Amino acid sequence: MAGSPSRAAGRRLQLPLLCLFLQGATAVLFAVFVRYNHKTDAALWHRGNYSNADNEFYFRYPSFQDVHAMVFVGFGFLMVFLQRYGFSSVGFTFLLAAFALQWSTLVQGFLHSFHSGHIHVGVESMINADFCAGAVLISFGAVLGKTGPAQLLLMALLEVVLFGINEFVLLHLLGVRDAGGSMTIHTFGAYFGLVLSRVLYRPQLEKSKHRQGSVYHSDLFAMIGTIFLWIFWPSFNSALTALGAGQHRTALNTYYSLAASTLGTFALSALVGEDGRLDMVHIQNAALAGGVVVGTSSEMMLTPFGALAAGFLAGTVSTLGYKFFTPILESKFKVQDTCGVHNLHGMPGVLGALLGVLVAGLATHEAYGDGLESVFPLIAEGQRSATSQAMLQLFGLFVTLMFASVGGGLGGLLLKLPFLDSPPDSQCYEDQVHWQVPGEHEDEAQRPLRVEEADTQA
């Protein structure tokens, strides 16, 4: 029986036990394998007779701060638009990112920085871990309100591994360039989440339809997330690019692309809106598509005009997606995309990957000069042509879509295990299922919810 004492006890213990197990296992693995790198270790750094001003901390940490704020504040508040799910949006973002950054340090460390029997970490490890956490949070947006915290932690456990493998294949085996993660972060996270949502499809989700909308103050809080993301996105795309002209160019291209996507979003929102009025959903999300679409190409010689054109296109495509494609996605394809990650991350991510194919194919020694080595080292060394680089960029997109689709399917099957607690159809998008909500009174909509109600569950 759904409401039996044994099930209630299991639900009470599920999250604490899983958190303790995952943190304990991670701590043991850190103790065995993780060590400071030579720029962090006291003895190794001073043995090299370096100046403290040469430490990468001073070059990379400002970007890390911005990326960190995007992950924990930007993503968290962007998802508080649901009128009864603000605690869960911010709280589960906090939980997922805190676990994902630890687990990804291990996974990425084994793949990228494992030597002499240890993983060596520094500030770049922190940035890479936050990038991985960002992909997990993108996937979270697709299933927001329909999953429990234990399910989300297991999703992160699987997704981080697949993210790390996909990133390793693209960046190290194929030599793909993807500085801002149009493919490795946005496309992967979006389609992993969308396939996951398809596997977890709820035919009776209409029972919670009254909670799916926003109210005035929840949309206002969500705009805080939008502004944080918009301001810091140039740092996100440029955080790990080559110091100097490459990093400068990446930030500049992202800056202009975001500005153009914002104007494109306002224009299309008014054009397709009822009586020419703006839709806050479009402004909160599609205005950010400019940061996604130049993720791959922002370190390349995209040109300021190219950045503006790409951003404007991404903003318009994303807005049209929210207006027309999201309803089709649910009615025809049975994908219930809560946050519209397909419109903000999926389509702009694919467009960004294709833009990277185009710009890589146009790369020449004349255009880049000595800077070709930092952007396309294999072309500079004569190991491949610009056309070959472009073809591998395109192949990298297909590899990412494959990893995301297979991973999302496996994740959906994992999250459907019967012993995992998830909210019934009539209690989705409701904080009271998982949180003590202060100030609640006796009206029917806000009474303590009964988990024993018989509904279809994910």
UniProtKB/Swiss-Prot annotation:
Membrane topology: Multi-pass membrane protein
One term under GO cellular component: basolateral plasma membrane
One Pfam family from the record: Ammonium_transp
Posttranslational modification: N-glycosylated.
Ranges annotated as biased composition (Basic and acidic residues): 444-458
Gene3D superfamilies, per the entry: Ammonium transporter AmtB like domains
Stretches that traverse the bilayer: 14-34, 62-82, 87-107, 125-145, 150-170, 179-201, 220-240, 252-272, 283-303, 305-325, 347-367, 394-414
Motif (Basolateral sorting signal): 429-432
UniProt region (Interaction with ANK3), positions on chain: 416-424
Location(s) in or outside the cell: Cell membrane; Basolateral cell membrane
Keyword Transport annotated: yes
Entry-listed glycosylation sites: 49
Cytoplasmic topology ranges: 1-13, 83-86, 146-149, 202-219, 273-282, 326-346, 415-458
Primary location recorded for the protein, binned into one broad class: membrane
Residue ranges annotated as Extracellular topological domain: 35-61, 108-124, 171-178, 241-251, 304, 368-393
Record-stated family: Belongs to the ammonium transporter (TC 2.A.49) family. Rh subfamily.
Name of this chain's protein: Ammonium transporter Rh type B
Gene source species: Papio hamadryas (Hamadryas baboon)
